[in-house]
């Protein structure tokens, strides 16, 4: 009887350890680290992939929409949505843009996001000159809300419970 109780206690301990380890791995799957980029450049940059292409995006919870530089679309799989809109510059000039949907991955997790296509060359070149970082667009609040991501600057990670 004592042996049976010891075996039962051991089995319970093994199950608890297994659930804890599984929870830690699951948590890692739901995290995006931007710590290295933040240390190097001062910017929260995350590298996604689409096939062999590495896609560096700036995480910006203040941007309502995700935006991609028009020059980078040629090399990527994307599907225009047919939706168009105007973007107004600081000088008051209006530029017509369109939206496209782009699939990409981070580690083994797949995402699809609708991006506003804009010529970001001057902004990207200025950031590159100041910080040395090269990125192709901005992941905005639309993505963060859709996938329930929170930016944690204490841990330098974006994480989700979804």
What are these regions (language model features)?
Residues 1-162:
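Pepsin/retropepsin-fold aspartyl endopeptidases
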